[in-house]
């Protein structure tokens, strides 16, 4: 309960709200106000804020107890918020200008090192998918594994997508915070399990970003890796666990990089889910007092799922017009299954290069086939479970809004 009380409204949260207001205003007024207009408008609040600051310092030297100081600080803060509003408008109009610019096709030789790395990673990912195909697994089993582990949802058919959507588990088909978190924890475990070790955290974060590059920089993975990087900074600073203030910092960084992130459904759902977990999870978790680690783990999983649903449910209803009635139950299958699938995929990734060692090749191939059989069994199980769930009476409430249909 004490943890709940510490979630105060901070300047970073105010910054993020005002920045968001500036971005939205600039997007819908772009036809009338360009970047030059917003730069010109921003001069006034900057000037007033600077004048208020200098007057405050001057009065403090001569009369520190003057009441005028409070008013000047108030005006200074007000104009700083206007400056932040203009900053959001400026970066938004600049981003729109960039999007409207003619597309230039570059030759491979003129690409930057980073762009070449992305292309090489794409080739490497295609080779990994082809290697999975050679292991002779079902089409939709492969599709689910490729979606979860490599961010490639192109092989998923409509029936599978619909089954996962109705059962409330479609989030595990996109590489997002859940997947990045699982991989991050696995890497820390493989490196010795020291969560506060600087070397472990730096290496784990670097490997996570290498993984994001490997799967082709999908927006959800980049978003999750950015939030994870900020979480890593919190761990390295030896401060308490992340709060809403940390989330606000992640939000500001990602919005400054790309202001149009705020209009992305996945972006909105990610931040609402994490914010809701930070707010409600401690409140729910403390309702059950048990000394059993197993019961606490199950209860913790339920509390995380419930807290995330509270935050994302309004968006799901608004955008999709659907409520998945069994999502809290299916999460007990989806999250452990996703964890096992990712762990086994990492094991396959580690074993794969060893097949080129002649005296180990036959043993490694047999072990890989065993891992693949387990992986396929898990995938078949969750595919069947979620299809059956989607067929249950009252599995979802549809067409809540007429416009959603």
Q: Where would I find each of the regions flagged by the language model?
A:
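Internal transmembrane alpha-helical bundles of multi-pass membrane proteins
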Residues: 5, 11-20, 28-36, 75, ...
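Helix-to-loop transition at the C-terminal end of transmembrane segments
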Residues: 95-103, 133-136, 349-363
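C-terminal ends of transmembrane helices
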Residues: 56-58, 189, 233-237
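Aromatic-rich juxtamembrane segments at the membrane interface
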Residues: 2-8, 17, 105-227, 232-233
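Ser/Thr-centered flexible coil motifs
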Residues: 34, 73, 112, 138, ...
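Cleavable Sec-type N-terminal signal peptides
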Residues: 41-44, 48-51, 55-58, 80-84, ...
